[in-house]
UniProtKB/Swiss-Prot annotation:
This is Potassium-transporting ATPase KdpC subunit. The system is composed of three essential subunits: KdpA, KdpB and KdpC. The keyword Transmembrane applies. Keywords: ATP-binding, Cell inner membrane, Cell membrane, Ion transport, Membrane, Nucleotide-binding, Potassium, Potassium transport, Transmembrane, Transmembrane helix, Transport. The lineage of its organism: Bacteria, Pseudomonadati, Pseudomonadota, Gammaproteobacteria, Enterobacterales. One of its GO terms (molecular function) is P-type potassium transmembrane transporter activity. GO terms for cellular component: plasma membrane. NCBIfam families: kdpC (TIGR00681), PRK00315.1 (NF001454). It is a single-pass membrane protein. It comes from Salmonella typhi.
Length: 194
């Protein structure tokens, strides 16, 4: 019995430390230093939660920028079903999906003459990505401008305004948050696109 006492004391100490003190401390520090991020990076407009800056949404109307395809099967951008498609690059099913997406994008963007950006045809690893490269957003500008009856230059300026650049070039590439950009388009016109 004497040999079990140190083991039990150590177990109880570690249980309290890792199951109580550490989680409470990290939660408190997160709330103190990074409250917006610790609470889900929620985007508020008109006193309502419109989305998260971390999770994409399904925008299908012509007046909105479209994000990457969602890999969640039943409901696009369902965070409960997060995960990649798990299809290998050599899988014919992936090739068929990409070809179908390219055809749909070409039909929806007849003004675009350049190649369809890769990230508009392939899902991200999580299937919930909300960011595009500035090039992929720029590829959609003519469609969005025409649908909203806005000058192309004004929409391009909005894309440039919502392009997030890393602190240093070796820390990543510039990205455009599609949720924020589409909400800014709505705010610009004071309504939602049809």
């Amino acid at each position: 019995m004497i040999g079990l006492r140190p083991a039990f004391s150590t177990m109880l100490f570690l249980l309290l430390l890792t199951g109580g003190v550490y989680p409470l401390l990290t939660t408190a520090l997160g709330q103190w230093w990074f409250p917006w991020q610790a609470n889900g990076s929620l985007i508020h407009k008109d006193n309502l939660i419109r989305g998260s800056a971390l999770i994409g949404q399904s925008f299908t109307a012509a007046g909105y920028f479209h994000g990457r395809p969602s890999a969640t099967a039943d409901t696009p951008y369902n965070p409960l079903a997060s995960g990649g498609s798990n299809l290998a690059a050599s899988n014919p099913e992936l090739d068929a999906q990409i070809q179908a997406r390219v055809a749909a994008l070409r039909a929806a963007n007849p003004q675009a003459s350049s190649a369809v950006p890769v990230e508009l045809t392939t899902a991200s690893a999580s299937g919930l990505d909300n960011n595009l490269t500035p090039g992929a957003a720029a590829w959609q500008i003519p469609r969005v401008a025409a649908a909203r009856q806005l000058p192309v230059e004004q929409v391009a300026q909005l894309v440039a305004e919502y392009t997030h650049r890393p602190l240093a070039s070796f820390l990543g590439q510039p990205v455009v948050n599609i949720v924020e950009l589409n909400l800014a388009l709505d705010a610009l016109q004071g309504h939602r696109a049809k």
